[in-house]
Each structure stands twice: as structure tokens, then as C-alpha cells.
């Protein structure tokens, strides 16, 4: 048995402009090649674009979009008897938010159009209304989990 104590769970820092942890999680997912200032610029431009499109608080739109995209259940591949099975597992709120952020970014990168700020803002607005690529991904995951419900005991 290990003599070391259990590691303290780290809390995400909040960003300087909005003072919001969710925004900071988003910035850390946008980040590419360590260019954090570029990620900040991209997100702030996106939120300004959201404000222009909806004339509402962009943070509330962001929260609503992430809430709607966050999955309750996911599937995980497990090997049993030479075959791989997709086993449905429940996921926690933090992991669910991380998945939602990842799906939102992936869906906005796939969108046609100009710059990333515009594509990401469009995806956020669509997700807050309950449509778009990220919502489709969530529904697809839920369908997959429902189809493989018989393997739920494999966990």
C-alpha cells in the first residue's frame, strides 16, 4: 500500500476578462501549440460575435450551449472473449463538460466558412437553440449507448 497521501484535486483557474472557469476550460481546449494569447483572442472575438448575433449575454449563451451538448452517458470499448463491445457508462459533470467543449470545437472546425471565430460563434448559437453538429454528436452517442444497453453489466 502506498504511503503517499492522495493528490489534491486541482481546480481550474478563471480567465482574466470574464472571471469564469468554464471560459478557461474552453480556452485550454482551443489552445494549439502553446499559443494561449491566440486562444484568448479567438474566444473573445467569438463571444463578441455571439453578442452581435443574439443581442444577449454571450456567457449565458455559452452556458446554455454547453448544457445542451453535455452528454449523460457515453460508450467505452471493452474487450471480452476476443470481441470488442461498446459498453455504456455514466459520466460525471466535469467529464461531460469536457466532452461537450471538445464536440463544440470539432463541429465548429468542420463548418464551412471564413474564420474560426465566426464558425465557433455560429455553432454556439445553434447549440443553444438545440441544433447543430455538436447536438447531433450527443444524440448519436446516446443512441449508441441505448443500442448497447445489454452490455451495461460489463463495466
From Swiss-Prot:
<dbReference type="InterPro" id="IPR005717">
    <property type="entry name" value="Ribosomal_uS7_bac/org-type"/>
</dbReference>
<dbReference type="GO" id="GO:0019843">
    <property type="term" value="F:rRNA binding"/>
</dbReference>
<keyword id="KW-0150">Chloroplast</keyword>
<dbReference type="InterPro" id="IPR000235">
    <property type="entry name" value="Ribosomal_uS7"/>
</dbReference>
<dbReference type="GO" id="GO:0009507">
    <property type="term" value="C:chloroplast"/>
</dbReference>
<protein>
    <recommendedName>
        <fullName>Small ribosomal subunit protein uS7cz/uS7cy</fullName>
    </recommendedName>
</protein>
<keyword id="KW-0687">Ribonucleoprotein</keyword>
<comment type="subunit">
    <text>Part of the 30S ribosomal subunit.</text>
</comment>
<comment type="similarity">
    <text>Belongs to the universal ribosomal protein uS7 family.</text>
</comment>
<dbReference type="Pfam" id="PF00177">
    <property type="entry name" value="Ribosomal_S7"/>
</dbReference>
<keyword id="KW-0694">RNA-binding</keyword>
<dbReference type="GO" id="GO:0006412">
    <property type="term" value="P:translation"/>
</dbReference>
<dbReference type="InterPro" id="IPR023798">
    <property type="entry name" value="Ribosomal_uS7_dom"/>
</dbReference>
<dbReference type="InterPro" id="IPR020606">
    <property type="entry name" value="Ribosomal_uS7_CS"/>
</dbReference>
<keyword id="KW-0689">Ribosomal protein</keyword>
<dbReference type="GO" id="GO:0015935">
    <property type="term" value="C:small ribosomal subunit"/>
</dbReference>
<keyword id="KW-0934">Plastid</keyword>
<comment type="function">
    <text>One of the primary rRNA binding proteins, it binds directly to 16S rRNA where it nucleates assembly of the head domain of the 30S subunit.</text>
</comment>
<keyword id="KW-0699">rRNA-binding</keyword>
<dbReference type="GO" id="GO:0003735">
    <property type="term" value="F:structural constituent of ribosome"/>
</dbReference>
<dbReference type="InterPro" id="IPR036823">
    <property type="entry name" value="Ribosomal_uS7_dom_sf"/>
</dbReference>
